[in-house]
Amino acid sequence: MPLTFLLIARLPDGGAEAFDAYEDAVLPLLAEYGGRLERRVRSLDDGTEVHLVGFPGEQEFEAYRNDPRRAEHAHLLERSGAAVELLPVRDLTSRNPPSGR
């Protein structure tokens, strides 16, 4: 069953550069596990970044999370000081289609 996650990263002042370095290292790995970065946005003050990420299933998601290459770059995430929250979500677009604005 496909999974979708919302990642919310709260970045302290000066943390964006290290967070970007971490993301540059780990986001390319998504494709190896069938994962997709559907959206990546950041607040204008660089204090919050949000990702919408999809995986074909739980097995692929867990394999991505346990990839040792992610652990190799964990020091960058720690150095960024980011507080990260990962929420499983579901799509409600069909209930309220975009208005076309």
Model-identified regions with their sequence ranges:
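Short S/T/G/P-rich N-terminal loop/turn motif that feeds into the first structured element of a domain
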Residues: 1-68, 87-101
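C-terminal structural segments of small proteins and small subunits
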Residues: 61, 69-80, 84
